[in-house]
Amino acid sequence: DGLVADVNIPRGTVVLAATPIGNTGDASARLIALMEGADIVAAEDTRRLYALANRLGIRVPGRVVAYHDHNERDKADGLLDQVEQGATVLVVSDAGMPTINDPGLAIVRRAIERGLPVTCAPGPSAVLDALCLSGLPTDRFCYEGFLPRKHSERVQHLRALKSERRTIVFYETLHRIDESMADLLDVLGPNRKMALCRELTKDYEQIRRGTIAEIRQSVVDDPPRGEMVLVIAGASEEEADAAAPATLSIEDLAVLSVDRAQEDNLRIKDAISQVVAEHPLSDGSLANRKQVYNAVLAMKD
């Protein structure tokens, strides 16, 4: 009849389907029907797919292929060739919705480029669950994925978000939560409201709510385990204004460039490039490096 049974999806379609993030009971009827009816299932981890099917008491009769971060670009076109021939390809990740910190984006982009249909069977999402349970504003938010691993990059990333007015959502691991909370405290200060959400939908689900300082102390006193989502209040108007970078004049940039060249033993042109990149103008553009260089020369006259 040209449709995948029970889900009203035309054959010859790529379907992204959300899988449970912890509680098997959250598997939707559409996910189950697709697992049973898709011609091909592209799974981030085939073992976890079969384990889910076993818990659901179903079979996966279609061809199952591994589709993960390391091969998704190479596999995308081969899967889409099958879609062109009328196959339904179901894409699933280990937990949650494909493409959200999981494989899937490559096949979506290539399908769009090739004019092939793509649709979703929505479902569980750790980002949205944590946001809803945090008690923080949900009308405007930004999702930042995992915080950078390296301390210096993490601090730089947080500084760039210091004036962000929207609620901010991160993922974090148990191995880095202590360091990340210390950096959040240093960069964003002690008083912002936040929530640390762990083991969402599982037996040991826990939501810790409080200020950054309070949650940081709770992490020290009682280190959390499991998968975590951090939800942090956006900056107040006063915080955003205070964190907004001041626009520096060409002369200011010249002084900073000379200092940078001396401190880091750089050529002046290299120092200028660094300083200009670090201090954008109020409209987001970068100062003219030649003008800064001329200002440096004028300082020497």
Question: Can you annotate each of these PLM segments?
Answer:
Residues D1-H68:
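Glycine-rich, flexible N-terminal cofactor/catalytic loop recognition
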Residues L3, R11, T88, T167, ...:
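A contiguous loop/helix-start segment that scaffolds small-molecule binding in enzyme catalytic cores
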Residues T13-A17, Q85-S93, F141, R166-F170, ...:
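Generic beta-sheet signal
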Residues M35-V41, G115-T119, T167-I168:
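Short active-site oxyanion
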Residues A43, V118-G123, F170, L196:
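General beta-strand structural signal in soluble alpha/beta enzymes
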Residues V65-D74, F146-K150:
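Conserved helicase motor
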Residues T99-R114, M181, L185:
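Short Gly/Thr/Asp-enriched flexible loops that form oxyanion-binding sites at enzyme active sites
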Residues A106-E164:
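Class I SAM-dependent methyltransferase SAM-binding "motif I" and its flanking Rossmann-like core
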